[in-house]
Amino acid sequence: MQIVRSCNSNNKPLIPSSNWHIAIRMRGDGVKDRSIDVLSLKHFESQKVVLPQDLFMDNFTWMFYEFFKCFTFRTWLLLLLLMWLPGFLSQIKSINRIFPFKLCILVSCLVGIFLPNIYSFSHKSVLTNQLTQFSKEIVEHAPGTDTHDWETVAANLNSYFYENKAWNTEYFFFNAAECQKAFRKVLLEPFSVKKDESSKIKSFGDSVPYIEEALQVYSTEFDKKWKLFNTEKVWSPDNLEHVQLPKKTYRYKFTWVLKRIFNLWLFPAFILFLACIYVSWDKGHLFRILCCGGGFLLMVRVFQNMRPFSMHMEDKMQFLSTIINEQESGANGWDEIAKKMNRYLFEKKVWTSEEFFFDGIDCEWFFNHFFYRLLSTKKPMFDRPLNVELWPYIKEAQLTRKQAPPV
């Protein structure tokens, strides 16, 4: 099976290989003129930016290719085979050539657990060592919240990492969305939570002035986008009087949650739930109840966390803009916000139905739990994005709802 689709006669990506020399004056304390190598903009104007998503059939084939180009992965795989080969051969001799089922399950689990972690660690290590170049590309191309803006940055960094032997392929970022996500995880969030200059220098070293300029450029582009949502109102709902909240359709919220849990998105969690029941069948009633209850609570937790991760940055901006501009106050205000966002997220195909929020109470909880709570703690959490660029607007939304007079 061919993994990579050819783009030209030489089966090479159309990313230009020629570089040009350009000097950029950096602003900051004690920062002098420094030269960087960036890909010629004229080439990008005449040719389409090509990323791995245009060359590979899908994300899986790209990752499969990257894994087998990774020296760490090949070394780990060899050690794993050497570790289990003697046991495998002895099992074959002792049980009449029947493949040991438990050994197969164990090896599969080890691969599933360690392989993504190895790849993620390698990616993060490369980015951590290339913060200055990452920042320079952002300053040069000024990307905003639109994922399309990050295509040139991703293509440039893919070529730069390969040419400077920081990565062993030209396909470091699969697409622009991965580059945008890396910016948030490696630059925006870690740098923003640092409280003083000394801690920034300790963590980021000589890259601090470049990161500061990159974040300033991104902040400017983000503010332009926010004005579209908050002043020009790029979207306004129609016929809201015919929209009903799920609380009027379902008798209980529990029924609404169950419907969301038992859909295709959470099918793996449902399989895990059934596996818990099967494993605990002969372990006693108490153990069985604990396993079943734990599996169900896990599925509820996954459902709650799935909602914010399904929203893009533009959707979150629309959510905050809707809160700030809502005229109704109190519980009625949150009901109206829930109606508008249910319609918006359905029209934008973020959610499959107009049932994203159960009611106004659920909408208010969602805002407090996934937005305002992070503004209060300003600490990264594994199940919630920090939304650093939204902090000023989260605070404004909270103050708006607090200042609203009761009905």
Curated annotation (Swiss-Prot):
Major subcellular site: membrane
Record membrane topology: Multi-pass membrane protein
Keywords associated with the record: Membrane, Transmembrane, Transmembrane helix
Presence of the UniProt keyword RNA-binding in the record: no
Subcellular location field: Membrane
Recorded GO CC terms: endosome; membrane
Transmembrane segments: 75-95, 98-118, 261-281
One Pfam short name: DUP
Gene Ontology biological-process entries: protein transport to vacuole involved in ubiquitin-dependent protein catabolic process via the multivesicular body sorting pathway
Family as reported in the entry's similarity comment: Belongs to the DUP/COS family.
The protein's name in its UniProt record: Protein COS9
Name of the coding gene: COS9
